[in-house]
Amino acid sequence: MFGKLGTSELVLILGIALIIFGPGKLPELGKSLGKAISEFKSFSKEVKEDISLDDKKANNTLND
């Protein structure tokens, strides 16, 4: 999921984030990040569906 990041790298990143943002902000930051990723995936899915639909329409037009 995280490419070639190992456990020690993830712990280091989490530790740095904890120092920078503090323990009170991390849950809020995680929630915001999760929501942003979810919205991005949803938007990406919509774009793929639109492109697929446009391709089907173009193929039908060419075949007629």
UniProtKB/Swiss-Prot annotation:
InterPro entries given in the database record: TatA/B/E, TatA/E
One Gene Ontology CC term in the entry: TAT protein transport complex
Coiled-coil residue windows: none
Signal peptide start-end: none
Membrane-crossing segments per the record: 10-30
GO biological process terms held by the UniProt record: protein transport by the Tat complex
Topology term for the membrane: Single-pass membrane protein
GO molecular function, one term: protein transmembrane transporter activity
Keywords: Cell membrane, Membrane, Protein transport, Translocation, Transmembrane, Transmembrane helix, Transport
Subcellular location(s) of the protein: Cell membrane
Keyword hit for Cell membrane: yes
UniProt key word Iron-sulfur: no
Family under the similarity heading: Belongs to the TatA/E family.
Subunit description: Forms a complex with TatC.
Purpose: Part of the twin-arginine translocation (Tat) system that transports large folded proteins containing a characteristic twin-arginine motif in their signal peptide across membranes. TatA could form the protein-conducting channel of the Tat system.
Protein name stated in the entry: Sec-independent protein translocase protein TatA
UniProt organism field: Alkaliphilus oremlandii (strain OhILAs)
Gene encoding the protein: tatA
